[in-house]
């Protein structure tokens, strides 16, 4: 650990008995809206191209997920940080921007982040291999949190290679099972990178703090075609058909835990699990209730431990960030998976990790002026 980092008084891999007994107060997530990324990673306020999961008929199985050319590599994701989420907030500012007694426009959320941030925190108690880094900015009483890759992953590391293969299989599976409003999304000569990525925006109250976050989502194809019906979110994952008694606990603590955490955060009640053989052929896809997934793993991990660690870590981060009120200052929080420790350092003012853009700060300033001139706008924003 670098000497300029300070270690938090929190340990992911050890917890008190109460952390396994009392589940914290977390309200059911609310779906607030959605947006899409363009093929080049830019925000598009698009609510029409919803991706639906449709299981192919039995005659289509087995489905081959094998690569035809070069082996897959870890997907390099664009460094968009929170850009698209902030643009969504700006496009729906009447829902999220308000003016308090200090006559400054601010968000009606204590935390803005991606679902990945919350997933990493909840999985940390059982993560022993892969560390991560988060960037945190606090501005006008809201913390903005996103994942920041301080170090590049080792391309020849076996865990990274395994993750790259799993991501490739999942992208390939989606070309067979994901449809855009009833129309197949991907042609065989196109990759998933050439299409929109659909994200939902969610919120919940976490021990009295409102958390606003986005996540990539898939929808359940409705049984009827009634207009205006609420979307029902699902998930699509892959697991081996056959695993040994030693393989199952490892799978449950890693892959299955991540599936459950994502479903919990988004309020997903069921997911589709594709079962593949050793030759990367999917033989069937089963719909599984999320509560049944948890019951099958209850000896390997505790959802109460996961949720409580997320609460503790967010509280620690809040205490560190309490004196900060600057859109450019970023604090880096690093999780050491081998030790189960979290450390941090602050980078004051504009720096290489600054991710809250000037346009967002200017947008809040503009709303401050507009709302002070028009009291009705202030009232409407405060009650949303």
Swiss-Prot record:
Keyword Transmembrane recorded: no
Entry keyword set: Chromosome, Cytoplasm, Nucleus
GO molecular function terms listed in the Swiss-Prot or TrEMBL record: piRNA cluster binding
Gene Ontology cellular component list: chromosome; cytoplasm; cytosol; nucleus; perinuclear region of cytoplasm; Rhino-Deadlock-Cutoff Complex
Location of this chain's protein in the cell: Cytoplasm; Nucleus; Chromosome
GO biological process: dorsal/ventral pattern formation; germarium-derived female germ-line cyst formation; NAD-cap decapping; nuclear-transcribed mRNA catabolic process; oocyte karyosome formation; oogenesis; ovarian fusome organization; P granule organization
Disruption phenotype: Females exhibit severely reduced fecundity. Defects in germline cyst development and result in ventralized eggs as a result of reduced Grk expression. Increase in the transcript levels of two retrotransposable elements, Het-A and Tart. RNAi-mediated knockdown in germline cells leads to decresed production of dual-strand cluster derived piRNAs.
Key word Secreted present: no
InterPro entries noted in UniProt: RAI1, RAI1-like_fam
Classification via Pfam families: RAI1
Main subcellular location of this protein, as a coarse class: cytoplasm
Role according to the record: Involved in the piRNA pathway in germline tissues. Part of the Rhino-Deadlock-Cutoff (RDC) complex that stimulates piRNA biogenesis from chromatin regions corresponding to dual-strand, but not single-stranded, piRNA clusters. Promotes transcription of long piRNA precursors by preventing termination at canonical poly(A) sites. As part of the RDC complex, is recruited to chromatin enriched in histone modification H3K9me3 and might contribute to complex interaction by binding nascent transcript nucleic acid chains. Associates with chromatin upon exposure to homologous piRNA.
Family of the protein in this entry: Belongs to the DXO/Dom3Z family.
Quaternary structure note: Component of the Rhino-Deadlock-Cutoff (RDC) complex, composed of rhi/rhino, del/deadlock and cuff/cutoff. Interacts with rhi/rhino; this interaction is indirect and is mediated by del/deadlock. Interacts with del/deadlock (via C-terminal); this interaction is direct. Interacts with Rat1.
Identification of the protein by name: Protein cutoff
């Amino acid at each position: 650990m670098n000497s300029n980092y300070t270690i938090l008084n929190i340990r992911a891999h050890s917890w008190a008995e109460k952390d396994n007994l009392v589940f914290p107060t977390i309200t059911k997530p609310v779906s607030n809206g959605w947006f899409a990324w363009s093929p080049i990673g830019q925000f598009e306020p698009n609510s029409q191209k919803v991706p639906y999961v449709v299981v192919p008929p039995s005659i289509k199985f087995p489905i081959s997920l094998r690569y035809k050319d070069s082996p897959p590599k870890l997907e390099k994701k664009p460094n968009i940080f929170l850009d698209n989420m902030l643009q969504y907030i700006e496009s729906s500012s009447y829902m999220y921007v308000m003016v308090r007694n200090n006559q400054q426009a601010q968000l009606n959320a204590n935390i803005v982040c991606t679902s990945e941030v919350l997933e990493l925190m909840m999985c940390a108690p059982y993560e022993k291999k892969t560390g991560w880094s988060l960037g945190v900015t606090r501005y006008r009483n809201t913390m903005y949190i996103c994942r920041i890759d301080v170090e590049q992953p080792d391309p020849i590391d076996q865990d990274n290679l395994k993750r790259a293969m799993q991501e490739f299989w999942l992208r390939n599976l989606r070309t067979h099972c994901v449809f855009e409003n009833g129309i197949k999304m991907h042609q065989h000569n196109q990759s998933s990178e050439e299409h929109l990525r659909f994200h939902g925006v969610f919120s919940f109250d976490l021990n009295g703090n409102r958390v606003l976050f986005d996540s990539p989502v898939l929808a359940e194809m409705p049984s009827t075609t009634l207009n205006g019906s609420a979307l029902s979110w699902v998930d699509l994952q892959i697991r081996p058909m056959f695993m040994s008694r030693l393989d199952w606990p490892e799978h449950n603590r890693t892959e299955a835990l991540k599936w459950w955490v994502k479903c919990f955060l988004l309020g997903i009640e069921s997911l589709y699990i594709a079962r593949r053989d050793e030759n990367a052929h999917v033989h069937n896809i089963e719909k599984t209730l999320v509560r049944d997934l948890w019951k099958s793993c209850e000896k390997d991990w505790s959802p109460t431990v996961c949720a409580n660690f997320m609460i503790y870590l967010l509280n620690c981060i809040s205490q560190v960030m309490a004196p900060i009120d600057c859109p450019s200052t970023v604090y880096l929080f690093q999780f050491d998976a081998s030790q189960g420790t979290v450390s941090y350092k602050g980078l004051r003012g504009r720096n290489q990790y600054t991710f809250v853009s000037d346009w967002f700060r200017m947008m809040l300033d503009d709303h401050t002026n507009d709302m002070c001139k028009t009291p009705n706008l202030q009232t409407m924003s405060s009650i949303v």
